[in-house]
Each structure stands twice: as structure tokens, then as C-alpha cells.
């Protein structure tokens, strides 16, 4: 890999084109992803501190994509039934352990097909994930399967060839993830370059997962080939977010933790996520609307009308992280 190809979100600036719309409200931020079209290319991370059932219902009702977490496995079947009873799409997560294979069999026997299934493990380029893709496609052929997480073009090709309908890219770039520190592996610090390399190899959609700090990073993800952007910490801490409010020195926070943290595992085993407090951010509707409006502005700067027009713009590598002495 050539060193010039290694960059992250803060190292890139997109180059403006002549604007062809009179108002940013004319810009269309929607994206087709699987069998549906969504308002913006953003999905809250499938983490216990980011998504729960009431929020999943709200998101589905308002044309946003969601992926329910997999940390209450006994309730997943009921969740699918309740969502479909409301005429809403069901989008769940599974792992790769034997009981997950059994769960897929149970869904098939019951005639329950969730529209979206995300196979979600920390190191998704594995034989276990490939076997799980095969199994889901055999038992639930109409489910749209997102597989991950991966960080290389080879992984994307293998998972797509196994039958994945989309792949999720990102090994430890997230704020609550310390995989890069504990193992020495990951896409932390070059997540955007990893998205670019993976998207170039992909024939199917890419989900950029992790490392998003600002709304402009969503546009950068789209520019480098992502169709959907998964966001954790920026979509935690809202009124609708799971977790209790804490007030410290007059400031209000909510708890947030990574997907394999001690808090979640309940015991100290292979911990690759950390606990933190995020500032209370009010209503999630306002945050998502701001993301949509900033994307509309990005489309206007790109000289386009539609989201994917962002893919054609030039970019410069500014390496601000080096200039500023940032080392995360």
C-alpha cells in the first residue's frame, strides 16, 4: 500500500464545484440501501448505548435505517414480530456462535424473514462469518445480509463472493474502541483510506463504520465509496438513547461504551471497548435533521443535486493530523 494512500477524515478536504441549485433544500440526500430508500446515508451504531427498540421504531417510522444490537438475543424474534406487526422493517444483528445458527433456523421454520440481517463481529474476515453468510442465504434468502467488520479489499471480495449483500468496514476506529491499542491491529488513523480501498474492490454497498467526528465526515465517506455511514458516539447521548442521565458539576451526560467493553460483557474477558460519558444532546430528531441539512450543503458544494454527486468531486490531502500534532 503506497503511503500517500493512507489518510483519515481530518486529512482530507473536498474541493468545491460550481453550484447548480438555488437552495440547498433542493438537494436530495436519500440513498437506496437494500430493498428500501432512506432519508440520509446514516445509521446509528448497533450498540446497546445507541439503539433500543423504541428508537428503532421511531427511526423506521421516519425513513431512517437502523440495526438493532444483538445483546438481548432472547428478544430478537419478538422484536422482528413486533416490528412487522407495525408494518415496519426489521433489521437485526447476529453473531457466529452455534446458537446463532440455531436462531436463523428457528426464524426460517417460523416463516419470519427480517428485511436486514447484520453479521457483526469484531474481525469479520473469517471462515465463521463466511459460513454464517452461506447459512443465512440458504435459510432466509430474502434477507439483505450486511457482513463485517473488515478492513481490507480481500475481505470485501471474500464476503461478497460468499453472498453478503453489503460489507461493513472499520476495525477499531471508533471513539469507544481500543482494539488498535490492545492488539496493534485496525483501521484507526486510516479509516477513510480503508473505506476507499474497500469500496474500489466492492461490487456491492459498503458501510463505513467508525471514526466519524463531524457531519462533514459523512460527505467524505460518501465521496470515497460508502453507501451508508454507521455512527456511534455522535448518535449517543440523546433523549431517546438508551442509558441513564448523569449530572456532574451541573453538566448532564449519558453513558456510552464500546461493543466489547467490560460493562457489556459483565466480566473481564477480551475487552476491546471502553466506557465513557457523552454530553447530553437533546432530541435525536434535531441531530439527524442537522446531518441532513449539512449533507444538502455538501451536495451543493459538490455542484450536484443528489447524494452520489459527491462521489465525483476532487479532494486534497492536507495531513492536518500531522500539522496539528494530533496523534490519535
Swiss-Prot record:
Q: Name one GO biological process term.
A: purine nucleotide metabolic process
Active site residues according to the UniProt entry: 177
Q: What is its EC number?
A: 1.7.1.7
So which domain of life are we looking at? Bacteria
Report the GO molecular function annotations.
GMP reductase activity
Q: What reaction gets catalysed by this protein?
A: IMP + NH4(+) + NADP(+) = GMP + NADPH + 2 H(+)
Q: What does this protein do?
A: Catalyzes the irreversible NADPH-dependent deamination of GMP to IMP. It functions in the conversion of nucleobase, nucleoside and nucleotide derivatives of G to A nucleotides, and in maintaining the intracellular balance of A and G nucleotides.
EC class, as a word, reads oxidoreductase
The keyword Oxidoreductase appears for this protein:
yes
Name the species this protein comes from.
Answer: Levilactobacillus brevis (strain ATCC 367 / BCRC 12310 / CIP 105137 / JCM 1170 / LMG 11437 / NCIMB 947 / NCTC 947)
Going by the UniProt record, its keywords in alphabetical order are: NADP, Oxidoreductase
* Entry keyword annotation includes Oxidoreductase: yes
Which family is this protein grouped under?
Belongs to the IMPDH/GMPR family. GuaC type 2 subfamily.
The name of this protein is GMP reductase
Q: Which GO terms describe its cellular component?
A: cytosol; GMP reductase complex
Q: Which residues bind NADP(+)?
A: 206-229
The gene coding this protein: guaC
Amino acid at each position: 500500500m503506497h503511503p500517500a494512500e493512507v489518510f483519515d477524515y481530518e486529512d482530507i478536504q473536498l474541493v468545491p464545484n460550481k453550484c447548480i441549485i438555488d437552495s440547498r433544500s433542493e438537494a436530495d440526500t436519500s440513498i437506496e440501501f437494500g430493498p428500501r430508500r432512506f432519508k440520509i446515508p446514516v445509521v446509528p451504531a448497533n450498540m446497546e448505548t445507541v439503539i433500543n427498540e423504541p428508537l428503532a421504531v421511531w427511526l423506521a417510522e421516519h425513513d431512517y435505517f437502523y440495526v438493532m444490537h444483538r445483546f438481548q438475543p432472547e428478544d430478537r424474534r419478538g422484536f422482528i414480530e413486533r416490528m412487522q406487526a407495525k408494518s415496519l422493517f426489521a433489521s437485526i444483528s447476529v453473531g457466529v456462535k452455534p446458537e446463532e445458527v440455531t436462531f436463523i433456523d428457528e426464524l426460517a421454520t417460523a416463516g419470519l424473514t427480517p428485511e436486514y440481517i447484520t453479521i457483526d463481529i469484531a474481525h469479520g474476515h473469517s471462515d465463521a462469518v463466511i459460513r454464517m453468510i452461506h447459512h443465512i442465504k440458504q435459510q432466509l434468502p430474502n434477507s439483505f445480509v450486511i457482513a463485517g467488520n473488515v478492513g481490507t479489499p480481500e475481505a470485501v471480495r471474500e464476503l461478497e463472493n460468499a453472498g453478503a449483500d453489503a460489507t461493513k468496514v472499520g476495525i477499531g476506529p471508533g471513539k469507544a474502541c481500543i482494539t488498535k491499542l490492545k492488539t496493534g491491529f485496525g483501521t484507526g488513523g486510516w479509516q477513510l483510506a480503508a473505506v476507499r480501498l474497500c469500496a474500489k474492490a466492492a461490487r456491492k454497498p459498503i458501510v463505513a463504520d467508525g471514526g466519524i467526528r463531524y457531519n462533514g465526515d459523512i460527505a467524505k465517506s460518501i465521496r470515497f465509496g460508502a453507501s451508508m455511514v454507521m455512527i456511534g458516539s455522535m448518535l449517543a447521548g440523546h433523549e431517546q438513547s438508551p442509558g441513564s442521565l448523569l449530572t456532574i458539576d451541573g453538566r448532564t451526560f449519558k453513558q456510552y461504551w464500546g461493543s466489547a467493553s467490560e460493562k457489556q460483557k459483565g466480566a473481564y474477558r477480551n475487552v476491546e471497548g471502553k466506557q465513557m460519558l457523552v454530553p447530553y444532546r437533546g432530541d435525536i430528531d434535531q441531530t439527524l435533521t442537522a446531518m441532513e441539512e449539512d449533507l444538502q450543503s455538501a451536495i451543493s458544494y459538490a455542484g450536484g443535486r443528489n447524494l452520489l454527486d459527491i462521489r465525483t468531486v476532487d479532494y486534497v490531502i492536507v495531513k492536518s493530523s500531522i500539522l496539528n500534532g494530533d496523534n490519535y
